[in-house]
Amino acid sequence: MEYDGRRPYSVLTRNEITVKMKKQINEISDIFFISNSDATVLLMYLRWDSLRVSERLGENKEKLLMDSGLKSVMIDPSPDSSSEISLETDVYEFDGDNDLISMPFCSHKFDSKYWREYLEKNFYYVEKIQTTISCPDQDCRSAVGPDTIEKLTVRDQEMYERYIWRSYIEGNKVLMIKQCPARNCDYVIEFHQENDDDDEYSLNVVCICGHIFCWRCRLESHRPVSCNKASDWLCSATMKISDESFSLYPTKTKTVTCPHCLCSLESDTKMPQFLTCVCRLRFCSRCLRSEEAHKIEAVDSGFCIKTEVGILCEDRWNVCQKLLEQAKSDLEAFEETNIKKPSDLLREQDIMIIREGLMLIVQCRRVLKWCCVYDYFHTEYENSKEYLRYLQGNAIATLQSYSNTLQEQKDIVLAAATYEECTFFRHTIPTATSNIGNYFYDFMKTLQDGLVDVKVKSYNGGTGPFWYCDRCTYANTWEDNECEMCYDDSASLVGEISDLFLNKVS
């Protein structure tokens, strides 16, 4: 079991869950002198609530056994009662009594083939777990326990064990446990109920396999987006956004979005020029192609063609997803090279510093990916959208700068011949990692709080004859979709002249 006292959950293996389950079964069996098979049925019937099982057995044992199907029932002795069993629309006929398997609480008999078909169709392969398994006869409520399953094939017994395990995980009323949703992962997360209301830690769960998921909805970690919005985004039928209101709006300052990392760069002129982003991509400000691709295009056509297709939410999502996968690959490559095969020149402290930095980049990339969803849902005010993209652009640029610094220092440390060459690294990177972590924490809090910095109370009232611009507080009529003062060319010119005058005076 992997447990950290600072975290409100534990990571358990499949074997540890099985041990806890069998211990619970044995306790009920020993205290109330019933078989392990009956104890298993009772716990499944009452959703693994040992306290409730104990109370019911102490109050009225016979009634509980009758309600759960663990009491013998009288069977109609008609000749057709065991010769033909109808299950919904299926009809199965038995030729004889050879190799028929019965249950201890009724006289219905079925062969192993029918048992397999019945269990797989109604219990093993259904999405919703059932509390208990009952007799295949529609009119019989006798419970099917492990003592009956033991008479079936080994394959059927293994399927039944997995079914009980699923019942313990998905139908448990007492323990807060969920299986890690990552593919091919058998780890189980047990959440400690005393810390359930702690929002600071209860949202994201980190499994030993490396997968990070939301405890509430079991989707991948989607901070700072809520569970409902994350589900709406992922369950969208086409994931294509055609409305122009969801695309990136041009601002009054000439800005260009990097096609690789989505950073916003300012352009000093309307003429095409080559810009160098913090991600080290050099591209044309007009066609948004890399310098090499731009030169090839210019040679073929004689000039570059302006890219008219805007960067939509889906485009931003895909770009951020690729960057996230690249960050994960960098982390896995470092762990494979330096942790599993440590070098004599690297201290354990140095390895952990680099690993923490790479892990932080993965987490920040995941946050930036889910921030793209905000642009999809946040359509209320244009200035709010501009401020949102401004925050996203700063976060992207800050993370890219940190990533470049970490990569440079990592290369220096890995190539260092003496420990003294790592002195600067040991002081710089931990501080930078802490700063980036704090920066993204504040960034997520800003988004989760609803971007209150760009909203004004006058917007929410809606009763006066004017609405006030949240940038310059100018009173606009409700017929105006944009602020007359902010988007007036003459007003912009006056502002520029005023700035020039102030600069000369100073």
UniProtKB/Swiss-Prot annotation:
Report the GO molecular function annotations: ubiquitin-protein transferase activity; zinc ion binding
Q: Where does Zn(2+) 3 bind?
A: C214, C217, H222, C227
Q: Which residues bind Zn(2+) 2?
A: C180, C185, C207, C209
The cofactor(s) it depends on are: Zn(2+)
- Binding positions (Zn(2+) 4): C258, C261, C277, C279
* Keyword Lipid metabolism appears in the UniProt entry: no
The EC number on file is 2.3.2.31
> Does this UniProt record's set of keywords contain Chaperone?
no
- Name the InterPro entries on file: ARIH1-like_UBL, E3_UB_ligase_RBR, IBR_dom, TRIAD_supradom, Znf_RanBP2, Znf_RING/FYVE/PHD
- Metabolic or biological pathway, per its Swiss-Prot or TrEMBL entry: Protein modification; protein ubiquitination
Alphabetically ordered keywords of this record: Developmental protein, Fertilization, Metal-binding, Repeat, Transferase, Ubl conjugation pathway, Zinc, Zinc-finger
Sites binding Zn(2+) 1 sit at: C106, H108, C135, C140
By sequence similarity, the record places it as follows:
Belongs to the RBR family. Ariadne subfamily.
Give the function comment from the record: Might act as an E3 ubiquitin-protein ligase, or as part of E3 complex, which accepts ubiquitin from specific E2 ubiquitin-conjugating enzymes and then transfers it to substrates. Negatively regulates male gametophyte formation and double fertilization.
Further details from the record: Transcripts of KPL and ARI14, encoded by adjacent genes organized in a reverse orientation, have the potential to generate natural cis-antisense siRNAs (cis-nat-siRNAs) pair targeting ARI14 in sperm, thus leading to opposite expression levels during male gametophyte development.
Write out the domain note.
Members of the RBR family are atypical E3 ligases. They interact with the E2 conjugating enzyme UBE2L3 and function like HECT-type E3 enzymes: they bind E2s via the first RING-type zinc finger, but require an obligate trans-thiolation step during the ubiquitin transfer, requiring a conserved active site Cys residue in the second RING-type zinc finger. The active site probably forms a thioester intermediate with ubiquitin taken from the active-site cysteine of the E2 before ultimately transferring it to a Lys residue on the substrate.
Q: What protein is this chain from?
A: Probable E3 ubiquitin-protein ligase ARI14
* Native organism taxonomy: Eukaryota, Viridiplantae, Streptophyta, Embryophyta, Tracheophyta
Coding gene?
Answer: ARI14
